[in-house]
Design a protein with these regions (language model features):
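Flexible loop residues that form catalytic
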Residues: 30, 144, 154, 444-445
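Short glycine-rich anion-binding loops that position phosphate/pyrophosphate groups of nucleotides
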Residues: 29-34, 63, 154, 330
Length: 621
């Protein structure tokens, strides 16, 4: 069994009585600095264990730096940081590297250690950088059962120094345990109250007081007419009516396939929530109530709600039968890692809810590949609405809608250059100090429209149509959920998960872009992206982070199906990776674990790592 303990979760005094129940400890990987107590926490104390309390320890990255620093090494900054960089690792083929051949390993560090000749820690492996010279990559303690590597053996791009090095550590740990006659106590189930659940873990279902007596039944009918326009369908269903709610998930270009139009009415249930509240707001038919969360958080409330809305009998070829459509804010994700969002300032400046969703029980699905359109409902006895909607769609004129040009003058206010450059320098200092492996610096650009455009061209819907025309993308969206309206045009889909049984969660991070232009061929785009250490490193960092997040939910059944492949889109070439995870068939999990898998993966993945890579940095920003 594996248990994950945060380095500030226990004091050594509290942990010490429980160490005999464990066979070994792995510490690391960071980010942070080993000479900052808040970064290293309990780890520093583990190196000082008395002989009777000693336990084999394997350090990774920050773990190596802490081990070496504790026993007399010097800590220095690299001349050139190595985040997401692959290096050849030299070793002597002994100890951790017994029966290990050539090693190409991924590094995520800006700090390194310099070992002293008379110290108690000795070098097992090293890299030889052009920029940094010789850098220690693995060490062992001369007398204690402590080993460590500076690189990341778990990275998807580490070759030769991964699983075999871990196996060697386990072999060395067992050998030391046998020689010293260390006794490992049998696990006591009562220890769950101290350490929580072993990895991986899906929480048991919340009480299902709202379980439906019978599942909702999906009724689906196909429209005979082929090739209906997404825009025409939307406008026939009320997209023009700015005062009403409207939702569209739009596959406006290849490789997107299905577009989903939510057919809303005044009785459609709206769900909103703001970070810090202890209630969910529910609105329909012009009335609103606040439902107390009780002991639940918003995530478990949503999972419980959706469990009560299970549907069956739909067309399995369609990705959506009914459910929640809307947005979740960045602040909701940041709140999950206990970072203050400056709540009072945030609410004063921003009236947009952090959770803004609508439950869609009637919908229209358009299939761009086949040209087919489907009308569906999960409301009982709703066949009349389906028939009338099909008749309305059948009678639509061909090509009736176009996006009108905006003739008003546009002024753009960019961020202050001096302030922006100073923020870049702050980011660079954080990177060199070891506070983070990457940072995403954002700044607001304000676009103002002068003049008085006509009401027909100034609506959010017309603006979305212009966006869709100028930048068609496979994962576009128009969400009009007052007080918020979201217009989106993106080639990237963050997360998808298939229906049970055999639910597969898939993430497709895009890091690396080349704009299409005359003379920019696929070969040139591939050279610019795949041939760029910076672009590959950025993609690799996110791939490894996603693998970590998925492993935390589904266990070891995580696979990188595609790594850094150039894909063609309407206006750009993109560097795309694909990571998938699913529950192991033999996992000891609740009977309905797959029902909550999507929610758990989404929760675990927020806030996205590229925007919140380090607690220290976002706490200070």
């Amino acid at each position: 069994m594996v248990f994950i303990i945060k380095n500030d979760e226990f004091s050594l005094q509290k942990l010490l009585p429980y160490l005999p129940y464990f066979s070994a400890v792995i510490v690391g990987p960071g980010p942070g600095s080993p000479d900052v107590p808040e970064d290293i926490g309990l780890v520093k104390d583990l190196w000082k264990l008395r002989e009777d309390d000693m336990i084999p320890i394997f350090g990774v990255c920050l773990g190596l730096q802490s081990l070496a620093l504790e026993f007399g090494a010097l800590l220095k900054r690299l001349d050139a940081v190595k985040h997401g960089q692959i290096s050849h690792i030299y070793h002597q083929g002994i100890d951790l590297f017994d029966n290990v051949g050539s090693v190409r390993a991924v590094r995520y560090h800006s700090l390194h250690v310099v070992l002293l000749q008379d110290g108690d820690v000795e070098e097992l492996a090293w890299a030889d950088d052009v920029e940094n010279g010789k850098v220690t990559m693995a060490v062992r303690h001369k007398y204690r059962p402590f080993w460590a590597v500076q690189y990341h053996p778990e990275s998807v791009c580490t070759e030769g120094g991964g699983i075999q090095v871990i196996r060697n550590f386990w072999r060395l740990a067992q050998s030391w345990t046998k020689v010293t006659s260390r006794k490992t106590l049998p696990w006591n189930a009562n220890l769950g109250a101290v350490f929580g659940h072993h990895w991986p873990y899906l929480p048991p279902p919340s009480p299902r007081s709202s379980d439906p007596s019978t599942p909702l039944t999906v009724v689906t009918s196909a429209v005979e007419r082929l090739g209906l326009s997404v825009i025409d369908v939307c406008e026939s269903m009320g997209a023009f009516e700015e005062s009403s709610s409207f939702v569209l998930l739009d596959s406006a270009s290849h490789p997107g396939r299905f577009s989903i139009v939510g057919c809303l009415s005044s009785s459609s249930l709206r769900i909103t929530y703001r970070v810090g509240d202890r209630f969910i707001s529910l609105a329909r038919d012009g009335k609103s109530i606040d439902e107390d969360l009780g002991t639940q958080d918003v995530w478990s409330w949503l999972a419980t709600f959706m469990h009560s809305k299970k549907a069956t009998g739909g067309n399995t070829g369609l990705p959506f039968w009914g459910g929640l459509i809307g947005y979740l804010s960045y602040e909701l994700g940041v709140n999950s890692i206990k970072v203050s969002t400056r709540r009072n300032e945030y609410i004063a400046e921003n009236q947009h809810p952090d959770v803004n969703l609508v439950f869609v029980d009637r919908s229209i699905i358009l299939d761009a590949d086949t040209g087919q359109t489907f009308v569906q409902s999960i409301l009982p006895g709703d066949e009349d609405w389906i028939s009338k909607t099909i008749a309305r769609l059948e009678s639509l004129p061909l090509g009736s809608s176009t996006a009108e040009s905006l003739r008003s003058k546009i002024s753009i206010t960019l961020p202050d250059k001096t302030h922006y450059i100073s923020r870049i320098k702050e980011c660079q200092e954080h990177l060199f100090a070891g506070d983070s492996y990457e940072l995403c610096l954002t700044a607001q650009t304000r676009i103002s429209i002068s003049g008085v455009p006509s009401s027909a061209t100034s609506t959010s819907w017309e603006r979305y149509k212009r966006l869709r025309k100028s930048n068609p993308a496979p994962h576009s969206a128009y969400l009009r959920l007052h007080p918020s309206t979201l217009l989106s045009s993106s080639p990237e889909r963050f997360l998808s998960f298939s229906r049970p049984p055999g639910t597969v969660c898939q993430l497709r991070p895009i890091k690396g872009t080349v704009r299409k232009a005359p003379g920019i061929t696929r070969a040139i785009a591939e050279q610019s992206l795949v041939g760029s250490p910076k672009e590959v490193a950025e993609n690799l960092m996110i791939v490894d982070l996603i693998r970590h997040d998925l492993h935390g939910v589904v266990g070891d059944n995580v696979v990188v199906q595609q790594f850094c492949v150039v894909e063609e889109y309407e206006t750009v070439w993109q560097l795309v990776s694909v990571i998938e995870g699913k529950l192991s068939a033999n996992a000891d999990l609740p009977a309905d674990a797959e029902d909550q898998l999507g929610w758990q993966v989404l929760k675990q993945s927020l806030p996205p790592g590229e925007f919140s890579p380090s607690l220290v940095v976002i706490s200070e920003s």
